[in-house]
Every structure is written in structure tokens, then in C-alpha cells.
């Protein structure tokens, strides 16, 4: 929240996307006020990605209940925030929004069921490809587009991936991911870091970005 607020204040053109806020760990009323502040500071350039997270230690660190890591709960909390922003069912809490209906919401959904639920409260996908695999990205886009067709909406398609450039690219990725994925255990983190992300040259990165664009991505 602090970093996004600072970026909102220091910039004037770029879109600010949070990918992702694990909203199931937090109070939705307080979150609504915090995100409204970023929306105001950025003059409407803020987009909010939400999800349930995958690290139990993150929940434990703030006293949140890991059993609440559910998409149904996430949907409820997003709707509470949207009610506050719209001021339809709750008294105005402030701060005032710059965007008329609040920030655009993207869902950090991975599985098919999560994507189906995301249709009810989001404007699209804040996806992630663990192995920087174009087919994985295409499949996720197709599932989201199919899910949104049922509500006659055109989803925003955003994805992301880890990458490293240069001669030490794979080694750099391994160093980062062994630390980042350490909660999985050293052996599993080490194994996953051998294939995760894209390790290559600037040309490799540009070519992959073009593939993602051709797959229908609106942003990476």
C-alpha cells in the first residue's frame, strides 16, 4: 500500500497495477479506504489485482486464518469494497474516489473454478505463468474469455512471469527463487527454480512478449 501510494504520487502517466493483493487476509472496509486513496492520488490510474495467495506463512504472520483462503470469501470482500466505493448501501467513508465506480478489479485466478467465480466480481485476469510457457498462457486466456462470455463481458487479459537476461540469467533466477520459494522446502524450491521463468537474451524476451501479445494479452 505504501509503495503504491508513493508511486501514484511520483508519477503522472503510467498505469499502476497491484498484482496481487491477498484480500482474504485483510479487512475489506480498511482495504477499500486504502485503495480509494491510491485511486485518488493516481487520478484514476490504479488497477487492483486480487487473489487468495498460496503461502500459509503470510496468513500466519498477521494472524489471519489460512482456512479462509477461499474464492467465495474473496468475492464477498470485493463486493463489500465495491459497495463502499459506490456508496449505495453504506454511508460514505471516504476518501472520495477519482474513478466513478472505483478501481478496475483483476482476478489472480489460476484454476478453472476460480476463473468462473472471478466473472462475478472482476473485470478480467491478472494471470501468471510459472514456467513462462506460451501454451499455458493461451489456455488461461481461453478459459477466462469463455467464462466471461456467459455474462456478455469482454475481459481484460493480463499475465506475468519471471525472467532473467544475460549469461547468468538462469543462475540469477535460481538464486531469487530458492529464496522466494523457500517456504516449499529447499529441495522443491531448488527443483522448481531450474525451469521456472524465462532465461535468455533480450531478443528472447521480446519474441516471447510478442507471442503473448498475439495470444490476446492486453498487458504483461
List where the protein language model places each region.
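Active-site-adjacent structural elements that line small-molecule/cofactor binding pockets in enzymes
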Residues: 1-220
Amino acid at each position: 500500500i505504501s509503495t503504491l501510494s508513493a508511486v501514484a504520487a511520483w508519477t503522472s502517466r503510467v498505469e499502476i497495477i497491484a498484482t496481487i493483493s491477498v484480500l482474504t487476509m485483510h479487512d475489506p472496509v480498511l482495504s477499500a479506504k486504502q485503495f480509494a486513496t491510491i485511486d485518488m492520488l493516481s487520478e484514476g490510474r490504479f488497477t487492483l489485482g486480487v487473489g487468495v495467495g498460496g503461502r500459509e506463512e503470510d496468513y500466519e504472520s498477521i494472524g489471519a486464518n489460512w482456512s479462509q483462503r477461499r474464492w467465495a470469501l474473496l468475492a464477498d470482500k470485493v463486493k463489500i469494497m465495491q459497495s463502499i466505493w459506490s456508496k449505495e448501501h453504506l454511508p460514505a467513508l471516504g476518501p472520495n474516489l477519482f474513478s466513478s465506480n472505483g478501481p478496475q478489479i483483476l482476478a489472480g485466478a489460476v484454476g478453472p473454478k476460480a476463473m468462473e467465480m472471478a466473472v462475478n466480481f472482476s473485470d478480467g485476469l491478472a494471470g501468471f505463468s510459472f514456467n513462462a510457457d506460451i501454451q499455458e498462457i493461451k489456455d488461461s486466456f481461453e478459459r477466462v474469455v469463455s467464462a466471461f462470455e456467459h455474462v456478455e463481458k469482454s475481459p481484460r487479459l493480463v499475465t506475468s512471469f519471471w525472467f532473467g537476461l544475460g549469461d547468468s540469467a538462469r543462475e540469477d533466477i535460481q538464486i531469487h527463487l530458492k529464496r522466494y520459494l523457500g517456504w516449499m522446502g529447499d529441495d522443491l524450491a531448488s527443483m522448481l527454480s531450474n525451469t521456472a521463468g524465462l532465461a535468455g537474451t533480450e531478443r528472447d524476451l521480446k519474441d516471447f512478449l510478442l507471442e503473448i501479445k498475439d495470444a490476446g494479452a492486453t498487458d504483461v
